[in-house]
């Protein structure tokens, strides 16, 4: 039997319709959204009676989820939006001609790659809606994007250098995101 699934996104009370999630503690949201099913069991969220698994299962790059939320919650035009999106790695993928012939074994790598292709697609959609200069995606590439989730030693040896390199390469583009102080978000149910 396949369990019923329902996509759910925790939301702050930045819109008057969002009445419940803001009560959930930040650690619980983080735990729910990082419950990678091959590493951790789902997170049982008692108030809702739901069990959450990693958001990356359906939105490995949530840039479009956020963009749709902003456009639906506020009276705002796309030209007022700038997006900074930081990824966790997107290794290069090439489908070998033999794999294209089919079969479960041949397509195993393609299935894994499909998760990364959706990441590229989400970024491309956001750039299409906003304009290419309004959405900056910083993503580790090559070998830096292929660290297994439980490989702490490799992450410790690779990620600091990778972050320094990506920061240096994107420094000028990043500066605009920190040039002025953002206004506080709207709060409809919680205290300011």
Predicted regions and their residues:
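Conserved catalytic cores and adjacent C-terminal regulatory segments
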Residues: 1-192
């Amino acid at each position: 039997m396949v369990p019923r699934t329902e996509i759910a996104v925790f939301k702050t009370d930045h819109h008057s319709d969002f009445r419940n999630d803001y009560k959930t503690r930040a650690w619980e949201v983080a735990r729910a959204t990082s419950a990678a099913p091959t590493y951790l069991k789902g997170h049982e969220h008692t108030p809702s009676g739901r069990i959450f698994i990693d958001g990356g299962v359906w939105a490995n790059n949530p840039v479009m989820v956020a963009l749709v939320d902003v456009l639906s919650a506020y009276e705002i035009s796309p030209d007022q939006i700038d997006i900074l999106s930081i990824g966790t790695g997107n290794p290069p993928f090439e489908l070998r001609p033999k794999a294209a012939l089919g079969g479960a074994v041949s397509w195993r790598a393609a299935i894994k790659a499909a998760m990364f292709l959706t990441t590229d697609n989400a970024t491309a959609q956001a750039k299409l809606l906003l304009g290419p200069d309004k959405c900056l995606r910083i993503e580790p590439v090559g070998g830096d994007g292929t660290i297994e989730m439980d490989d702490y030693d490799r992450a410790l040896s690779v990620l600091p250098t990778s972050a320094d390199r990506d920061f240096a390469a994107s420094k000028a583009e990043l500066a605009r995101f920190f040039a002025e102080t953002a206004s506080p978000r709207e709060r409809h149910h919680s205290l300011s």
